[in-house]
């Protein structure tokens, strides 16, 4: 039976490239000359360091632009509130990986409401969709693309 997986993943290599490009842009921008503003990447957490909260907002715009240019959907960003002290300001931005249980249940409910003849099951942070016809699976893909979710969804592991 044909099947496919619904996942929400970010390519680590593209993320590294986007952060490097954002750091390069910071070094060339006039409004950041002489400041110690920078992006640091550890795993899937990007830390912004700047001298003020205002600069953090500008840096976030730079990061979003670079992520978009590298093909990474900015809906995967989970921004914490900025921390300010005398030495400067910091903000952590977590890159969301995988589909949470609540979001998976919402997607499954949308699939069931469409009355398509497919089965869906949760496999950890993935969602496996199985059906008898390829056309049904393609209809589910269209449905999931239209569904309002705050995560970027990708489809992989398509089996016939």
Swiss-Prot record:
Disulfide bonds: none
Keyword field: Nucleotide-binding
A GO MF label: nucleotide binding
Nucleotidyltransferase among keywords: no
Protein name as catalogued: Nucleotide-binding protein BAV0791
Annotated function: Nucleotide-binding protein.
Family listed: Belongs to the YajQ family.
Keyword Nucleotide-binding among record annotations: yes
InterPro entries: DUF520, UPF0234-like_C, UPF0234_N, YajQ-like_sf
Taxonomy, superkingdom: Bacteria
Any GO CC annotation of this UniProt entry: cytosol
Family matches, as Pfam families: DUF520
Gene3D superfamilies referenced in this protein's UniProt entry, alphabetically: 3.30.70.860, YajQ-like, domain 2
């Amino acid at each position: 039976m044909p099947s496919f997986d619904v996942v929400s993943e970010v390519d680590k290599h593209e993320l590294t490239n986007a952060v490097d490009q954002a750091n390069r842009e910071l070094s060339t921008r006039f409004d950041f000359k002489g400041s110690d503003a920078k992006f640091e990447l550890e795993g899937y957490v990007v830390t912004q360091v700047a001298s003020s909260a205002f600069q953090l907002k500008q840096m976030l715009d730079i990061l979003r632009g670079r992520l978009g240019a590298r093909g990474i959907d900015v809906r995967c960003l989970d921004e914490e509130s900025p921390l300010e002290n005398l030495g400067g300001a910091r903000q952590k931005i977590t890159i969301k990986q995988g589909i949470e249980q609540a979001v998976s249940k919402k997607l499954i409910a949308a699939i069931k409401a469409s009355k398509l003849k497919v089965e869906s099951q949760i496999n950890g942070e993935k969602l496996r969709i199985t059906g008898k016809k390829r056309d049904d699976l393609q209809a589910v893909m269209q449905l999931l693309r239209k569904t309002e979710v705050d995560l970027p969804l990708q489809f992989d592991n398509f089996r016939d």
